[in-house]
Design a protein with these regions (language model features):
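Charge-rich, low-complexity N-terminal segments
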Residues: 1-117
Length: 117
């Protein structure tokens, strides 16, 4: 067996409101609005004795408490998300999930941001 590295991903969803305080007056995102966010979490590593990088339930256990902080909340009130752009939300997740290689945050079907290590 080779020492290969594998990547796995899991998708989550949450709904939140936010506004972007650092955009100019008149910009539509300066106003309070909401999104049905989708996030893709990618984890990488060597396969363990079970043949997993991680069991998906292990990723769920890491992500669930983070989603509880964001779901149906005003993101601007969450520490680290005072200016909650999609890029900053992705970074917020990346910094809090062990072994995470990348996080992609979708604000809608057409717009996303990705942050990686």
């Amino acid at each position: 067996m080779t020492n290969s590295i594998a990547r796995i991903g899991r998708t989550y969803r949450f709904e939140s409101a936010h506004f972007l305080p650092k955009v100019p007056d008149g910009h539509k995102c300066r106003n309070l609005h909401g999104h049905n966010y989708r996030i893709d979490i990618v984890v990488r590593g060597a396969l363990d004795a079970r043949g997993f990088v991680k069991d998906f339930s292990e990723i769920d256990a890491l992500v669930a408490p983070l989603l509880l902080q964001l779901d149906h909340r005003l993101l601007n009130e969450v520490e680290g998300l005072e200016n909650p752009t999609a890029e900053i939300i992705a970074r917020w997740f990346l910094e809090r999930i062990a072994d995470c290689e990348s996080v992609r945050v979708y604000e809608n079907d057409e717009c996303w941001a990705e942050v990686s290590r």
